[in-house]
């Protein structure tokens, strides 16, 4: 079993394709030209971080009560990765058992060793801003959205897992599950531009793969069937939308641009650009757009 699990990631390498990262000036994994962000006084050259800091400053100026809060968690930090490590450490530490400063150093080290995690976090912030009508500012997602925070905890845990540091990776998984109510195994491979909307009750298994530009609502399970070992979890393509309460079980493939209806139980492959309905016996219907990006949930008669 261990050998099988260790071999499968080679078929699903971590990658940052240009179609979901072309708006991020700091993405260096594609040859596609990227228009630079407009220059601004005090700009770091990191578009997402600069925008997030500007939003934080606006909120701090408008609400004096929040000035220290925003200063400590955002405005005093030199980078998105630094701010993220500090914020997650504050939420995941255990007083008297898991010191906040040591946890911050662990998270910061994992993010520094795996810069792809930081690029994915930036794409996740942009996804929340663009797809969630309740998200007025990226800084609100960064500070308050449990789905985003749980996903970034997973990215750090996955970095540690990839470096064969299994014990601290499992520690982060456990704490994220306890604090955020989201359980993602550190072995799972998740692309960028992900929206975990509401997120409570999301479970993603060890050998699951999630593509790019995917939107997942609350109470979704990407799990095994309980009868298999090795590579036993779903493979979700790009631009997929998975509705609330859906369960995708086993080593099945969900094609690019597919939609899994709320409450659906999926036990077999779903073709590209089709909808898997929650009603047993209904055939998958074709989709015209990427539901994971448009966030439209539609079922034809």
Curated annotation (Swiss-Prot):
Subunit organization: Homomultimer.
GO BP of this protein: cysteine biosynthetic process from serine
Top-level lineage group: Eukaryota
Any Pfam family matching the protein: SATase_N
Its EC number(s): 2.3.1.30
Family to which the UniProt record says this protein belongs: Belongs to the transferase hexapeptide repeat family.
Catalytic reactions on record: L-serine + acetyl-CoA = O-acetyl-L-serine + CoA
Signal peptide annotation: none
MF terms in GO: serine O-acetyltransferase activity
GO CC annotations, alphabetized: cytosol
Organism: Oryza sativa subsp. japonica (Rice)
Pathway: Amino-acid biosynthesis; L-cysteine biosynthesis; L-cysteine from L-serine: step 1/2
Protein name as catalogued: Probable serine acetyltransferase 3
UniProt keyword annotations, A-Z: Acyltransferase, Amino-acid biosynthesis, Transferase
Family annotation (InterPro entries): Hexapep (IPR001451), Hexapep_transf_CS (IPR018357), LbH_SAT (IPR045304), Ser_AcTrfase_N (IPR010493), Ser_AcTrfase_N_sf (IPR042122), Serine_acetyltransferase (IPR053376), Trimer_LpxA-like_sf (IPR011004)
Keyword set includes Acyltransferase: yes
Keyword set includes Transferase: yes
Region annotation (Disordered) ranges: 280-301
């Amino acid at each position: 079993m261990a050998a099988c699990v260790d071999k499968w990631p080679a078929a699903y390498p971590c990658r940052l394709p240009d179609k979901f990262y072309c708006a991020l000036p700091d993405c260096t994994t594609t040859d596609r030209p990227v228009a630079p962000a407009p220059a601004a006084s005090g700009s770091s050259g990191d578009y997402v971080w600069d925008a997030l800091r500007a939003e934080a400053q606006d909120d701090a100026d408008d609400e004096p009560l929040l000035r220290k809060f925003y200063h400590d968690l955002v405005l005093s930090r030199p980078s998105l990765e630094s701010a993220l490590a500090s914020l997650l450490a504050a939420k995941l530490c255990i007083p008297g058992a898991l010191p906040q400063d040591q946890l911050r150093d662990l998270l910061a080290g994992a993010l520094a060793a795996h810069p792809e995690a930081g690029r994915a976090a930036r794409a996740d912030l942009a996804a929340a801003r663009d797809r969630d009508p309740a998200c007025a500012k990226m800084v609100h997602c960064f500070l308050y959205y449990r789905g985003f925070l749980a996903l970034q905890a997973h990215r750090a845990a996955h970095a540690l897992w990839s470096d064969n540091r299994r014990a601290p990776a499992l520690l982060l998984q456990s704490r994220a599950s306890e604090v955020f109510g989201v359980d993602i195994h550190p072995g799972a491979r998740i692309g960028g531009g992900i929206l975990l909307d509401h997120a409570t009750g999301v479970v993603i298994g060890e050998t699951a793969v999630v593509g790019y530009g995917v939107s997942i609502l609350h109470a979704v399970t990407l799990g095994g069937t309980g009868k298999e070992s090795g590579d036993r979890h779903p493979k979700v393509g790009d631009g997929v939308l998975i509705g609330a309460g859906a369960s995708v079980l086993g080593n099945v493939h969900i094609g690019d641009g597919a939609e899994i209806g709320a409450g659906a139980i999926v036990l077999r492959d779903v073709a590209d650009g089709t909808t898997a309905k929650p009603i047993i016996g209904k055939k998958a219907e074709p989709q015209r757009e990427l539901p994971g990006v448009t966030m439209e949930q539609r079922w034809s008669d």
